[in-house]
Every structure is written in structure tokens, then in C-alpha cells.
Amino acid sequence: MKLKTTLGLLAGRSSHFILSRLGRGSTLPGKLALQFDKDILQNLAKNYEIVVVTGTNGKTLTTALTVGILKEIYGQVLTNPSGANMITGITTTFLTAKSSKTGKNIAVLEIDEASLSHICDYIQPSLFVITNIFRDQMDRYGEIYTTYNMILDAIRKVPTATVLLNGDSPLFYKPAISNPVQYFGFDLEKGPAQLAHYNTEGILCPECQSILKYELNTYANLGAYICENCGCKRPDLDYRLTELVELTNNRSRFVIDGQEYGIQIGGLYNIYNALAAVAIARY
């Protein structure tokens, strides 16, 4: 091990020890370690199977649900606290990791879209998950396609990684990457094709730029879309929600590929997060 790496580990872990005794959480340990060795994250993460969760909405819940499911299988899963989703926070997470009792090191990381490409210079995820891309964070990152291209640039750095996408989003149709791609989405009863109630993002057909219609529209621009001009339609789903059993303000029950699940939270958008978590666990 190089001297700079040793010093980085010492500085990072010592600061974490002190901060934890003071009852304070911080990304400072990662920041200190990176000042000694800018490549320290690469060394810390090299023996992990890594799942990256990104997107403008739902990252935190998807990550938490995924960690909960995987802990039942493996007992121990490394993850970063909500908000610690840039390189200093990710480095702190690996600095303070405990050794796995099962011998299988798994990390599920929530990563900020704008930081993802830089972080992927130092980690090798086996799975990328994009929850969705909506306009809520566009003040930070510009237009929807700018954010999407930032994420794709990161994914291209790890061409062997599988990419799990929300198949109900037209934005994710045939992404310009060489990676293997899988899709999750709602596979409920379809009706006549009609315009989305609230396509607030103004997403058009990804093939011919015509206005899309929907045989099933869950919310916003998500659902079983179809273009009546060129025939483009939602891709086949690998992980399917096939039934909504219950949906209230504080509870949801649903069926994914024949198995019923429930979460103590309402909202269709949260069911998408749960669907993504189940898909990750089954991957």
C-alpha cells in the first residue's frame, strides 16, 4: 500500500472516530482522505459488488428499500446516508465500512446525478438503476436531456454493468449505451390510446418526435406509451407490477410478477420505487 493511501486511511478513520464520539455525522473523513490520496476510493471499493441508484426522484426510498431486502438475504449491506451522495460522502461510507461476515461485500449507493460520472472514475458498479428524470431538479442541472446525458456518460465508463431503467418513461427508450439493459414498469390493464393527462415534461416520441399517446398512463409521462405515427412503444418489461391491491394515503399493496408486496406509504411514485427495489434484489 502506498504511503499516501496509508496516510489517507489514517486521517479519514481518525476523524471519523472523533466525530462519532461527538455524535456528529459528516463527510469530512472522506474529504480528508481524498486530500492525501485522490484515488483512495478506488482502493476502498475494489472488492465490492456495487449497485448505484440515481435519478431526480426516489433515490433515497429506492436505496432504503433495496438495502432492507438485501440485508434479509446477506445480513450486511454497505450504504451511504441520504445526502452523502457526492464523492466525499461515498468515500466516507467506504472508509467506515465493517468487514462482511458472509464474505460477500455488497454496496448500494445513492449517487447524485451530477457527481456520478466523476465517482465512476473510481468505482466499478455491476448495476446502475435510474429511477426517473423529472423537472424538479432542473434548476440545478438544466434540461431533462442534459441530466440524462450526464448519467449516460457515467454509465459508458462501465460498459460491463447492467442498467435497470423505468420502462414506463419514454426518455429511457433505447438508451445510447452498449451496456445490457433491463426494464421495470406497470403492466396493468390497458385501454384505448389517449393523450397523457399531465405530460409536464413534454416528452415526445423518442423515434419521430410526434406526440405520444398512452394505453395506460400512471402519472406525468409514465406508462404504456405508444406512437401512432411510427409505431414506437414501450419496451417489454423484465420486472412487472401486475396488480394494485390497495392504494391509500399511507399504505400500498401490489403484486410484482406473481408475488404480493406492501409498503407503509402511499403514492404511485413510491410504488415505482418499491418495484425498482424488488427488481434490484432479483437481478
Residue map of PLM features:
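Phosphate-binding loop of NTP-binding sites
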Residues: 2-204
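Adenine nucleotide phosphate-binding catalytic loops in nucleotide-utilizing enzymes
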Residues: 185-283
